[in-house]
Amino acid sequence: MEKMKILWVCNVPIPRIAADMNVNVPNICGWLTGFANSIEKLDNIELYIAFPQLGIKEIKAGTVGKIHYYAFSQPKLLGFLPVEDQVHESKYMREHLRTIISKVSPDLLHIFGTEYPHSLVASEEFNNPEKTVVNIQGLPSFYWMHFNNGIPYKELKRFTLSNIARGNLLQQAEKMKRRGMTEISTIKAVGHVIGRTDWDEACTKEINPRVQYHFCNESLRDSFYSGSWEYQNCEKHSIFMSQAATPIKGLHFMLRAMPEILKNYPDAHLYIAGNDLTKTDSLYGKLKISSFAKYIKRLISEYNLEEKVTFTGSLTEQKMKERFLKSNVFVSPSTIENSPNSLGEAMLLGVPCISSDVGGVKNMLVHNLEGYIYQADAPYMIAYYVKKVFIFGI
């Protein structure tokens, strides 16, 4: 029986591929691994995965298990800036994707995410809308409107040396808006989208009323389907956030909630996955600190939280799971999300969850039954629900 050939175009390699290529294993998009593992078990599908690699001039190809992979060129902006700062394609990128698509000759092109130029380039080079589907992740064409919610205007315009490369917070939102223009073109160029929330359906239908919308929940990382949170084993009065690198993740709201929490629970502690964005103990650290990180640093100082906030450093899948299970409560205070995977992972493990009422969160979590949802710009409600979890232990 002839196999169906599916070509994925992703923003990053799955960990197995990254390990095979001897490049850094990404801690994002881990849910792709579960999806790939499921497809790999099917005898009637041949899976190919293409993804960008910064600065390469030749296609890199290989195989892991039954999965074939190709790395194509992702240009360096100004010679060094990483992918998230890019809004333009490159000559190599288009040539590489054209070659990969021609070689694979896929029956279906499946694009994961719409936020980068390679998504549009792939859809254009394949040029078959009815056999092209886009998996909606975030939607920068809408995200940019919420990028700086809750940050004072003077902070938005504040200058740091890192602004020379990144721009200030207003400019970063504008950059996201420009990436959104590419996204709009991509969604208009395809015949199908896969989503999972009212929010992403509303957004994609606004962009392309003719696109066919298919509902499909995401597979999460394999390890989160086993194990269960237990109150007696958690660090009492500990709070966990899974990301905080950008304003969208809402750390500024969480920090504003901490003083009220500490009034009743002086031993409360906030753990944040990822490197310490406020660290300035070297000349390089002082030069690269962003204006958002400086704002966070000021909030920590203003509320005397220096001993109450810990950045865990980058966490592997297993370490992330361990951190979830140790936590008394998980909080997602984002200014916008579609369906945050971290919230899904916390819910799978049974960790008490609190989330801002943004994007598609209401399609994931039932308020007062599976956790608590609060008004996104109300840190006092974060404090209220955190204390409620601490009181009842669930």
Regions found by a protein language model. Give the residues of each.
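Conserved donor-binding/catalytic core segment of Leloir-type glycosyltransferases
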Residues: L7, E230-K249, L255-E260, L270-A273
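Nucleotide-activated donor-binding/catalytic signature segment of Leloir-type glycosyltransferases, i.e.
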Residues: Y284-S314
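Short alpha-helical donor nucleotide-sugar binding micro-motif in glycosyltransferases
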Residues: I101, S314, E322-S327
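N-terminal subdomain of nucleotide-sugar transferases
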Residues: M1-E58
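Membrane-proximal helix-turn-helix segments that form the acceptor-binding/catalytic region
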Residues: G34-F35, L156-H192, E206
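Conserved acidic donor-binding segment of nucleotide-sugar-dependent glycosyltransferases
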Residues: H367-N368, Y372-P379, K388-G393
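Aromatic "clamp/platform" in nucleotide-sugar-dependent glycosyltransferases that forms part
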Residues: T335
